[in-house]
Amino acid sequence: MPVIDETPMTYTEACRYFPGGVNSPIRACIPVGIVPPIVSSASRDVFIDSFGKNFIDFCGSWGSLIHGHSHPKILDALCSAASQGTSYGLTSENEISLATTLFSCLGLQDHKLRFVSSGTEAAMTSVRLACGVTQRSVMIKFLGCYHGHADVLLKGMTIDENNLMEVPHLVDRYFSSDPCLPLTLILPYNDLKTFEEVMEKIGERVACVIFEPIAINMGVVLPEAGWIESIITTCRRYGALSIMDEVVTGFRMGSRGMRSILDVTPDITVYGKILGGGMPVAAVLAHQSIMEHLMPVGTVFQAGTLSGNPIAMAAGQASIELCQERDFYPKLENLTEGFLSPIEDFIRCKGFPIALVRAGSMFSFFFRETPPRNLRDVQECDQKTFGIFYRHAFSRGVYLSPASMEASFISSVHSRENLAYTQNVLIDSLVKTFEGI
């Protein structure tokens, strides 16, 4: 009889096989100074590590799990789809079903989409598509916004004065005539004046402007009034395409996302996370006049062996159907409000220098007096003190997203019991952090 090794798998063992012990860098939890847990299993709002310790999960696979871990409807869909084949390399019924559900949910006509396997892939495809449609090669993004790890999109994630290029320098020396090689220009987030000045000078050379309607990867940083609307309007004025990255906000901020909340119509929208129900699914969506520039109809290349994977499509179908259930978002809003309001009141009462910023069921603790409006503000936060606060909470089984520049998330299945426990833990952790008790 074989001997079964029941020794818990550890982070040290993971480091033997993976750089930094992880397959995505933030999972190493370096910003908060903890040894990252190795997950054994997860259900609803809790995961269990390899030592058998329970953690209440407020990361939720970085916002993907709005329905929590191991939702029965999603698991049933996965098992049923897997029994019919794991991958076809052909268009499947599941792809058509999910697309039908999406267009019905979003209330869109005359649009088409392309399924891919990650937010990075979707954002990368959207930029390539915009360059092909416009035959231009300058892309604008905003400092601190994250759109995946493609080379042209990864710039501008930290403050670097050399990245904030002078416009004449850009035009005279760096403009490329090859639409397949976009040049990235990085501008400050929430700075409409600078954006409009740049567009006035080079707008006719800009292929696209990509933006998050709510910045998530520097923590939850809210757009100022009129910011998103002005981006889209200005793009139209100069013939550039606007790309709204709803990888995180899509189906998190309501069934129709930020395009409905803000009443805007970007040229291209990118979805992911919740769209896959925990499986690798993302999508690029636009009016058919734009989407038909993609091969095989047009000339802009995009391909993927696992794009539209039938198992992932089934999980996505179940996830979106759950989002469409009656009162799903009002209930989630009430759950989040009831959880965060007492913590916010406590912070205000004690006068702690913390801005607790919330958007829907997403939230961030910024260790500064006022909510940040851009990356520079975020980087002025007290990261060291945040780490102390985080470690106090983590030691008592509360797992927030492990960096001050990341959002945490509430799921629809967070129990009131676990939320009440977490309230007490977070309040106690704040007291220990600031008063040394």
Curated annotation (Swiss-Prot):
Top EC group: isomerase
SUPFAM superfamilies xrefs: PLP-dependent transferases
Keyword Cytoplasm included in the entry's annotation: yes
Major localisation: cytoplasm
Molecular function GO terms recorded: glutamate-1-semialdehyde 2,1-aminomutase activity; pyridoxal phosphate binding; transaminase activity
Keyword Isomerase: yes
Known EC number: 5.4.3.8
Family per record: Belongs to the class-III pyridoxal-phosphate-dependent aminotransferase family. HemL subfamily.
Name listed for the protein in its UniProt record: Glutamate-1-semialdehyde 2,1-aminomutase
Organism name: Chlamydia caviae (strain ATCC VR-813 / DSM 19441 / 03DC25 / GPIC)
